[in-house]
Amino acid sequence: MKHITGAYFSPTGGTKRALESVCSLFEGETELFELTGPDKKGKTFGAEDLLILALPVYAGQRPAVPGLLDSLKGDNTPCVILATYGNRHYDDALAQIKREMGGRGFRCAGAAAVITPHLFA
């Protein structure tokens, strides 16, 4: 991989901590990109890059934040999806996110659901 980016939405910090743990498994530097942060400019990724996308799941769905993933554009870019959840099952959120990311030019290379403290706990 030429470059690894960890993109995340983490209202309570748990999803970001889970992402940081996964990113620490890779050699080299990983850039973290907050999807709702002030630097929301578009990011374009190539086939030699890796995106690790971390999102919380509420009631089996990714957050319904308008435009949350609009800044991510891939070109047959490998993507690892990390879904965090708390008090309820994540249902088919990984499959939903995989489909959405496929439409943005990413191909899913892996996925995981991780339990973290939940916003509504």
Where are these regions (language model features)?
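FMN-binding flavodoxin-like domain, especially the glycine-rich phosphate-binding loop
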Residues: 2-5, 10-121
